């Protein structure tokens, strides 16, 4: 269900702005998107896992808040991010 350290490092390298960037909204959204994707796959086999479903809704809400922040600050950056991650909006 959770992402591996190697995958998280790869996501950070892929979405960071500079060499020391690990916490920008883009990186956080990319990591949350990966976790959401993993949980969505989990529900294909465990449809009645309501405890995890609540966690999924929390992750989606957190990602939505970060995306709203990016959109408020820079619309072009927001559009590029959702296109790169394949998020529909």
Swiss-Prot record:
SMART domains according to UniProt: Ribosomal_S15
Superkingdom assignment: Bacteria
Keyword tags: Ribonucleoprotein, Ribosomal protein, RNA-binding, rRNA-binding
Record field: compositional bias (Basic and acidic residues): 1-23
The UniProt record lists the keyword Isomerase: no
Coiled coil: none
GO molecular function, one term: rRNA binding
Pfam families: Ribosomal_S15
Gene Ontology BP annotations: translation
InterPro entries cross-referenced by the UniProt entry: Ribosomal_uS15, Ribosomal_uS15_bac-type, uS15_NS1_RNA-bd_sf
GO terms under cellular component: cytosolic small ribosomal subunit
Claim: Transferase is one of the keywords in the record: no
Region of interest (Disordered), residue spans: 1-25
Listed PANTHER family: RIBOSOMAL PROTEIN S15, BACTERIAL AND ORGANELLAR (PTHR23321), SMALL RIBOSOMAL SUBUNIT PROTEIN US15M (PTHR23321:SF26)
Function: One of the primary rRNA binding proteins, it binds directly to 16S rRNA where it helps nucleate assembly of the platform of the 30S subunit by binding and bridging several RNA helices of the 16S rRNA. Forms an intersubunit bridge (bridge B4) with the 23S rRNA of the 50S subunit in the ribosome.
NCBIfam families in the cross-refs: S15_bact
Subunit structure: Part of the 30S ribosomal subunit. Forms a bridge to the 50S subunit in the 70S ribosome, contacting the 23S rRNA.
Family as reported in the entry's similarity comment: Belongs to the universal ribosomal protein uS15 family.
Protein name: Small ribosomal subunit protein uS15
Annotated source species: Methylobacterium radiotolerans (strain ATCC 27329 / DSM 1819 / JCM 2831 / NBRC 15690 / NCIMB 10815 / 0-1)
């Amino acid at each position: 269900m959770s992402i591996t350290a190697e995958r998280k490092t790869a996501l950070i390298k892929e979405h960071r702005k500079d060499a020391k960037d690990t916490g920008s909204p883009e990186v956080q959204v990319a990591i949350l998107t990966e976790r959401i994707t993993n949980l969505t796959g989990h529900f294909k086999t465990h449809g009645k896992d309501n405890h995890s479903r609540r966690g999924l809704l929390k992750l989606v809400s957190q990602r939505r808040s970060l995306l709203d922040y990016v959109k408020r600050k820079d619309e072009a950056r927001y559009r590029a991010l959702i296109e790169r991650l394949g998020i529909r909006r």
